[in-house]
């Protein structure tokens, strides 16, 4: 059996008596006692997640912008100011999603990308192939010397500033999806991005791995609650945010995964997968579902791979959970394109067909329930 990978915070999680699980080959905390309380901390105050299993990759060279114009489906032409970030899919020639990622622009010769843990090796091999085929001459460097801590919630930024006072000046004016580099902190040189995966405000902090445990402990002392993968999943689902490998993969078009907004077909770029997207168009709708209650009770919980029956044909739930914020069972589903917001569909749970309402995503954003 292959040994699990450990983040630099593994000992810290175990010291907090975290329940650890195998997450894509990484030994990760699913919770530290109460997933519900961790979820609530992020919605109402501040929680933090170890996301050091994700991989930072640095791209340097004179043609780095041209490389990303070809490599990703979103348009790096939108990246004009240092620190600006862009969410995009990385596509194969068939239009399937190799990964979803965030690209940060710092200079015309330096871009930084954060990719998912389970796809990092595949992504880096693909980047290297595109670099070689296109003769871009870039240096592509995975940075496993970095760790990442996501601090999320309405009070997250204030608690980061209390922990790292020297970061306030550089980050207090940051708009969402922007990052700043903060040098010379007690935790080393940091990259602090106003991004996240919870539907709340906050920062994702890229920190030298050798300093991350000290930062983690300092954040805890300033009232930031450690949170595990369990709360991360319920938070991202409420926030309408896709999970790679579950809501989309190499065989699924972003147009069929609710990610059309991340694909820029307006600019005349020859990006990988464009021809396939234009040929196939949108073949399915990607929607939210809320399980209907009978006599105030839901007859089950919506889960991935349950069948969705509609008058227009069958679909499938890609992600599902019980929402702590809404006290409802919620899901994402890929369904026939004719299904409309407001429709009622049937979900096969065990041996029953139970009604669910089709809603627009997201369910919750900035602590407010949006889907009714």
Swiss-Prot record:
| A GO cellular component annotation in the UniProt record | cytosol
Which InterPro entries does the protein's record reference? Answer: GCS_T (IPR006223), GCS_T_bac (IPR022903), GCST_C (IPR013977), GCV_T_N (IPR006222), GcvT/YgfZ/DmdA (IPR028896), GcvT/YgfZ_C (IPR029043), TrmE/GcvT_dom1 (IPR027266)
UniProt keywords, alphabetically:
Aminotransferase, Transferase
Please name the GO terms that the record assigns under molecular function.
aminomethyltransferase activity; transaminase activity
Any one Gene Ontology BP term: glycine decarboxylation via glycine cleavage system
Which EC numbers characterise this protein's activity in its record?
Answer: 2.1.2.10
**Which ranges form a coiled coil?**
none
Source taxon at top rank: Bacteria
Supply the enzyme class, top level: transferase
The reaction(s) annotated as catalysed by this protein in its Swiss-Prot or TrEMBL entry are:
N(6)-[(R)-S(8)-aminomethyldihydrolipoyl]-L-lysyl-[protein] + (6S)-5,6,7,8-tetrahydrofolate = N(6)-[(R)-dihydrolipoyl]-L-lysyl-[protein] + (6R)-5,10-methylene-5,6,7,8-tetrahydrofolate + NH4(+)
Q: Does the keyword Transferase apply?
A: yes
Q: Which family does it belong to?
A: Belongs to the GcvT family.
| Functional note | The glycine cleavage system catalyzes the degradation of glycine.
The subunit field of the Swiss-Prot or TrEMBL record says: The glycine cleavage system is composed of four proteins: P, T, L and H.
User: What HAMAP family has UniProt attached to this entry?
Assistant: GcvT
Q: Provide the protein name.
A: Aminomethyltransferase
Q: Which organism is it from?
A: Burkholderia cenocepacia (strain ATCC BAA-245 / DSM 16553 / LMG 16656 / NCTC 13227 / J2315 / CF5610)
Point out the gene that encodes the protein.
gcvT
